[in-house]
Amino acid sequence: MLAVVGAAALVLVAGAPWVLPSAAGGENLKPPENIDVYIIDDNYTLKWSSHGESMGSVTFSAEYRTKDEAKWLKVPECQHTTTTKCEFSLLDTNVYIKTQFRVRAEEGNSTSSWNEVDPFIPFYTAHMSPPEVRLEAEDKAILVHISPPGQDGNMWALEKPSFSYTIRIWQKSSSDKKTINSTYYVEKIPELLPETTYCLEVKAIHPSLKKHSNYSTVQCISTTVANKMPVPGNLQVDAQGKSYVLKWDYIASADVLFRAQWLPGYSKSSSGSRSDKWKPIPTCANVQTTHCVFSQDTVYTGTFFLHVQASEGNHTSFWSEEKFIDSQKHILPPPPVITVTAMSDTLLVYVNCQDSTCDGLNYEIIFWENTSNTKISMEKDGPEFTLKNLQPLTVYCVQARVLFRALLNKTSNFSEKLCEKTRPGSFSTIWIITGLGVVFFSVMVLYALRSVWKYLCHVCFPPLKPPRSIDEFFSEPPSKNLVLLTAEEHTERCFIIENTDTVAVEVKHAPEEDLRKYSSQTSQDSGNYSNEEEESVGTESGQAVLSKAPCGGPCSVPSPPGTLEDGTCFLGNEKYLQSPALRTEPALLC
């Protein structure tokens, strides 16, 4: 085993010997020197050198201890050995903690002092052994079965999924080598020639530890005679709804039947035989077409492998090349659901994927004005979009979908259209507030001006309203105030009325003349008469018109009783006139 590895051993050189008190008679026995430890997988090799004492009588013993243990433990394979090397395994120790070794020389009852090496962590100093390889030949392919380093050991027990393998294959008669990289324990190398001898070798690699093994021993194998039944090739898988569609190439005849099987992805990453781990697909058994459809529920793992076999009567082809399927790459998620938040000139769009397989994918949205057909597309690796520099108070519509371009150049369907109206911008808001302020201020100013105007009109131009006495006069029925005119000329007789509060006027008509009588508590004839022009209006209407003369006229009496406060005389056509506006002094009544 060690000769195969051929790797430089890790040499742990001991420092200056630590001399312990020797046993009786061992004063001249020196401890071993140049102690080093070489580890490959779980196999330890401890080496040292002696000082040239007679090897026939000197033996050596080794002990070890770990960081978790203060007590030194004996190495069973390294007790009282006569050689300067011993090999052993420590399967029960923790390879991730520091371990320390020491060796001493012994001769009879005498022993040397112990010579210790510096502590080290076995996991980081261990080497990987070449993987074990087993070959299986077909007519046009070779199956390579690989066992990882330290198959049943403790050193790489947790690292098996991290190993990758490099396979070098060549025809025995040629030096042209082909390199194949694999992460599986079984690798099928197709497209070989029948009845041809191929040789190959394999090495293991641990990328994170930056370690690799040596190549395994070269093995050669010959492919078989070409099979009468060709192998189905060019397997393709597509997803349609909730089903998978498996297609392959084959020059089929009417009697050729096909069957397909699937293998969970994790099964190929485990060592050992897996021929019994392939599972049949019921809807792809004994089909005559070069395709079959099966439900996604048939396969319950996220990753799996497919292969197809052809048969005709008693003849059966080899299994096709294994097709790796990642369900995340083939199953399209449903259309996403979007939410849109509107701002003044911005729309915030969040794309909510409806399936967990959307993780790590890209997203695309398209948006446009509701009144336009010009669409704008945006693509991101995240579900959040910000649409800036939009028009305020404008309706925009948005759709989104999930992209698989990095994997299979496929996309989901677009989501439902969602339309949202942007809010007023800051500039529009200022103008709206300013406009409302101007309108409000204008209304207040107009109202104030109107109030001032009404006040000025009331003060400077009071309403021309007749006195209350005239209002009361005109409030009587017209028929009672009419004075019938006759063709005869009549005279007016005036009387002086003194100290009167009430003036009663009675009008009587006679066929020959108009007779007017005045009654009062006290009356006295002044002997003064006043004639005024008589004004006649509308003889057709038959109404008498009052004539008025300024006080102090022909009557020569200042402010005579019977006048109004504004100094106006009136004709005595009234039947009754009673008003506090009449003066109590003697007045001239015409």
From Swiss-Prot:
Q: How far does the signal peptide extend, from start to end residue?
A: 1-26
Report the main location listed first in the record. Answer: membrane
Please list the residue ranges annotated as the Fibronectin type-III domain. Answer: 31-125, 127-226, 230-327, 332-425
For the Cytoplasmic compartment, the record's topological domain ranges are: 450-590
Which cystines does this chain contain? Answer: C78-C86, C199-C220, C284-C292, C397-C419
The cross-references to SMART domains, in alphabetical order and at most eight, read: FN3
| UniProt-listed Pfam families | Interfer-bind (PF09294), Tissue_fac (PF01108)
Modified residue annotations for Phosphoserine: S526
Enumerate the Gene Ontology biological process terms.
Answer: cellular response to interferon-alpha; defense response to virus; gene expression; positive regulation of DNA-templated transcription; positive regulation of interferon-beta production; positive regulation of interleukin-1 beta production; positive regulation of type II interferon production; response to lipopolysaccharide
Q: Which residues are glycosylated?
A: N43, N109, N181, N214, N314, N370, N409, N413
Family the UniProt entry places it in = Belongs to the type II cytokine receptor family.
Instruction: Report the protein's function.
Output: Together with IFNAR2, forms the heterodimeric receptor for type I interferons (including interferons alpha, beta, epsilon, omega and kappa). Type I interferon binding activates the JAK-STAT signaling cascade, and triggers tyrosine phosphorylation of a number of proteins including JAKs, TYK2, STAT proteins and the IFNR alpha- and beta-subunits themselves. STAT proteins are then phosphorylated by the JAKs, promoting their translocation into the nucleus to regulate expression of interferon-regulated genes.
Q: What is this protein called?
A: Interferon alpha/beta receptor 1
Q: Which organism is it from?
A: Mus musculus
Lineage start: Eukaryota, Metazoa, Chordata, Craniata, Vertebrata
